[in-house]
Amino acid sequence: MNGDFTRETFRPQRHYWGVLRQQGRVNIDADWNEQVRIARHHDVARTADLVGPSGGPIAGAGFGLTVDAAGAVTVGAGRYYVAGALVENESDVALTAQPDPPAGLPPTGAGLHLAYLDAWDRHVTAIDDPTIREFALGGPDTRVAVLRGFIV
């Protein structure tokens, strides 16, 4: 992942539950980023503990596959959890038209085929999404967003 970060300070084995700011001290990105990582670690671990390695809500579970008469595969809308991390698909989408398309073509022909949901995080910069640039400050990029990508 790319970004201009001071340092990575999050270590799960320290068992910190938060980072507290002190008055009159310098505010640095490492403290903020560690708090974000602590919260994410707790959220993902809690979800994995309660849901299991993967799963979805009873109503609204996403990523179900349907095949039409012509053999076209559609990935269903909804939410699913992969290793405790939330993955969302806002609308039904053709297998071949996913936001992060697969490198190869889907299998063709009759028979059994294996499908699985793969998810990952990636940084999104102002180059990727100009709306995250801070125009009120003259246009610098003040942050990097983290996007959860997926592919079936």
Where are the regions that the model predicts?
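Beta-strand-rich solenoidal segments
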Residues: 2-21, 69-152
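N-terminal-proximal low-complexity accessory segments that begin disordered
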Residues: 1-74, 79-82
